[in-house]
């Protein structure tokens, strides 16, 4: 949200995500400049109006068929997680991550994969 709305940065995070092997970005109905607010930037507290915004946004995620929602805003992550922890099981299967955490996870998974592979160095007898 803030990265885009206040700084005009929309494509750079998508480029980083697209660089991850095996990951496909599926845009929601409202994304980029048209993305709907989760309620935090609108300075709403966790009231019914903010909850309604989060539910609408999560329905957009559900419509994509994606199992993970990525956002550049850590406050959005907190707000959407709040919806999940309010006991609304409808969204329990959707993981919500900020882009940096997602990319860090990918790097760590790649490091683990590389560490578990046999070394490419051949053992040569003299």
Where is each model-derived feature located?
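Iron-sulfur cluster-binding electron-transfer modules in prokaryotic oxidoreductases
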Residues: 1-126
């Amino acid at each position: 949200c803030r990265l885009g709305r206040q700084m005009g940065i929309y494509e750079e995070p998508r480029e980083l995500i697209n660089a991850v092997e095996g990951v496909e970005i599926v845009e929601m109905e409202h994304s980029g400049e048209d993305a709907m607010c989760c309620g935090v930037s609108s300075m709403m507290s966790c009231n019914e109006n903010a909850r309604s915004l989060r539910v609408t946004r999560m329905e957009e995620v559900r419509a994509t068929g994606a199992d993970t929602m990525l956002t550049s805003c850590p406050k959005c992550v907190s707000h959407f997680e709040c919806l999940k922890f309010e006991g609304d099981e409808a969204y329990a299967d959707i993981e919500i991550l900020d882009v940096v955490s997602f990319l860090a996870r990918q790097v760590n998974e790649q490091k683990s994969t590389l560490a578990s592979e046999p070394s490419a160095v051949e053992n040569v007898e003299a």
